[in-house]
Amino acid sequence: MAGPARTRLARAVGRSRVRGANLRPAPNGARPLPAASVVGVDTGGTFTDVVAWRGGQRVAFKLPSTPRAPAMAVLEALARAGADRATRVRHGSTVATNALLERKGARVTLVTTAGFEDVLEVGRQERPDIYALQPARIPPLVPRERRLGSRERLAAGGGVVLRLTDREIAAVVKRVRATRPEAIAVGLLHAWSAPAHERRLAGALRALGVPVSSAVALVPEIREYERIATTVANAFLVPRMRDYLRTLAASGRGQFEIVLSHGGTAPPARAAREPVRQLLSGPAAGLRAALAAARACGFSAALSLDVGGTSTDCAFLGGRDTGADGLPRRRGREVAGVPVLCPTLDVHTVGAGGGSIARVDAGGVLQVGPGSAGADPGPACYGRGGPATVTDALVVLGAIGGDSLAGGALALERVAARAAMTRLARAMHAGSPERAAEGVVRVVEARMEAALRKVSVESGEDPRGAALVVFGGAGGLHACALAAALGMPAVIWPRDAGVLCALGALEGGSRRERSRSVLVDARNEHELASAIQHLEHEVLSEFAVAERGHVRLERRAEVRMLGQAHELTVEALPLASLAKRFHVAHERRYGFADRDAAVQVVTLEVGGWLPARLPHERRLPLVRRRVAARPQRVRAWLAGRAAKLPLWQREQLVPRATVRGPAVVVDDGATLWIAPGWRARVHASGALVLSPGRDS
């Protein structure tokens, strides 16, 4: 990014406010703040969020993201946070996700077993929409001319059918060189059970001087389509993520750890080799902090709702099928049309955020999202000529008060927002910009509600016993309506809600995961125990020797009845009762269990978790800042008429204070709408806990 865009960013950085510390140079004679010891950075499509420990204080702020040069916003943020070479930086981002979504990756050549070159197109032969007369197919990441077959073959059990010769390896290397690849993916049939062929071939291909991704090293599991598709996606992302991470590492702004999709972190070198494990790093980071906020307020289970500028991420936390840490996990999922067979936190994402564009389609129907105005030009209220968005609708309705966003990083132009809603109202025949804005909010909240139902009711979890934890810049604006629709008893708006994913990245700790397909009878305890011990050794070897005694190990098994096509994940230990746990899980999921059927363990997984060690926070006095004795009054549109509502700055609200709706609470980087009939109480943890009144 250069020219005017860089200038706008610099101005925004100059305007940003940081909670808890003055980051400007200290005056003559004053003692400057020390460098930040730990920093969490989460880069989204619209904003880059930062939480740092500096001088015993926790500081938090937002900056506009720079999508054309994503490292720029991260480095600006670290400079503002006072990071130096000794600072530990935990970073989650959407760089890998966006590269896959936009298909802006490397020129990849795939090498697989001869006769299986079309596995990426054949897939599972499943139609995502069985009623589509002309179903749309997503093109594979590698075209047919760069999918090459190698003359070798293994049987399903690992026996050699056709041996891979040195002559064949030399021929494959020559053919691959002719395709001029920027990255290479290698995935041979059944190599998970006998990896020698694939390892030899991948080793020879590395002589070409480009990154080589091997399926047997990345995901040594059954299911060739998913395994090879994951490997291709990894190769597709390696050059871009390698350059991005090198830029960060060369900046001298800290010792980086990269947040992965399972919620832990990895060093940059490993993250650059396996970028496919980062595809959900941003959403994953916030879940741990969200669950901690819920438990601090007395709730063991929670629905998380992270509403940012581009998308909404939600998950059910502390449910029946979560791990020992209360976080929902799954082995694989589809990202941007590509199956990814890697451990992830189970986050559901929809294209509905503050920047979601509102428009009327050719049939006269109001559509909101999934397209987003992003950071540039952004919503109309940014004053850059952007389209009408959800944020503009909330500005017109008065739910977003004040004259700036993101803690002062962006000036708010209400006239531009109203003009955009007026144009939309004409297209909708809505009569007024306020009525158009109400329609936009109803549509986007319907999509958010459907997403919350998918991860709760449709997954066998009852939301009525859980709290709704809302975060992100816009999560608090939709909280009351969504909680009421789901019959939930409380909403939790955590401290630093606007940057909770950055806080989650900072607090995430280190995690390593290893898995292996075994296809063993559940009664074969000796073979299962041996495989688990091997995986435990692999996981522990990735931690420093001094850390290994503090690592918490988790063992899981993917199990099925013999003959089934899909598995359920259960705790692996104790092995003697593994089959019993599977039958209980099967009956809970499907309503029946055949306890006489043979039970097969398909894949074993071991995870190692090393909690983060953070500095003790020195709490600031509540009276540090002078605040108004009473709230401001802002104009709003409520129940079809104009009204004036109280607007509170969050710092005005001391513990145990109560605010009754309708009201607006503004924090640096986030806004909370307290609906009529709801009341908010300030919890000792700093969170605001909302509950419906008797009249709601």
Residue ranges and their predicted role:
Residues M1-V108, A155, L162, D166-A185, ...:
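N-terminal glycine/serine-rich phosphate-binding loop of ATP-dependent small-molecule kinases
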Residues R11-V13, P27-N28, R167, A171-E182, ...:
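C-terminal, non-catalytic interaction/recognition modules in large multi-subunit enzymes and RNPs
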Residues V50-A52, F61-T66, T109-G115, P135-R137, ...:
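Glycine-rich phosphate-binding loop of actin/hexokinase-like ATP-binding domains
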Residues A52-V59, P128-Y131, P140-V160, E224-V232, ...:
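Gly-rich Lys/Arg/Thr-decorated short loops/hinges at beta-loop-alpha junctions or inter-strand turns
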Residues G56-A79, A114-F116, P139-E168, V172, ...:
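Phosphate-binding loop and its immediate beta->loop->alpha context
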Residues A71, A77, A215-R223, R227, ...:
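ATP-dependent carbohydrate kinase catalytic cores
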Residues A106-G158, A215-V219, G504:
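Active-site phosphate-binding/coordination module
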Residues A191-T230, V606-L622:
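Terminal amphipathic helices with adjacent charged low-complexity linkers/tails
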